[in-house]
A protein has these predicted regions:
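Basic, low-complexity segments
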Residues: 1-22, 99-111
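Short, amphipathic alpha-helical "recognition" segments used to contact nucleic acids or chromatin
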Residues: 27-43
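Heptad-repeat amphipathic alpha-helical coiled-coil interaction surface used
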Residues: 37-40, 93, 100, 107, ...
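Helix-turn-helix DNA-binding helix
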Residues: 55-60
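DNA major-groove recognition helix of helix-turn-helix
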Residues: 62-70
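Short Lys/Arg-enriched helix C-cap and helix-to-coil transition segments
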Residues: 69-95
């Protein structure tokens, strides 16, 4: 796991007074789900899953349940908003850098065709 993701997870779980683990207890599942959905806006579902030692299908499941969770799962929305804020801080820059790298590669390839 890269340092940005590790730092993101530490900053996310600290105010929730949770230590990330693989428990199926509601507070852990809720926190994990909210963070996975927020991270999936900046990373592939496979990358998100790997950062939690989970398969991408877990991220797909949580993403699909997100809207329902916002309305029916007490505390989920607050966790999600915290996760979004932290992801925008920690992951947005990386996402932009990756896109710029791809564009630079495409420009070089196109210049080679000219």
């Amino acid at each position: 796991m890269n340092d940005d993701i590790k730092r993101l997870q530490e900053e996310y779980y600290a105010p929730l007074y949770l230590t990330p683990n693989t428990s199926r207890k509601a507070p852990q599942v809720q926190a994990r789900a909210a963070l996975m959905v927020a991270m999936a806006q900046h990373m592939t579902k496979t990358e998100v899953g790997k950062s939690f030692d989970r398969d991408h299908s877990t991220v797909v499941h949580h993403t699909g349940q997100h809207e329902a969770n916002l309305f029916s799962w007490d505390g989920y929305e607050d966790k999600y908003l915290l996760a979004v804020r932290l992801c925008n801080t920690h992951l947005r820059y990386n996402s932009i850098e990756d896109k710029l790298k791809t564009i630079r590669i495409q420009i070089k390839r196109l210049e080679g065709l000219a």
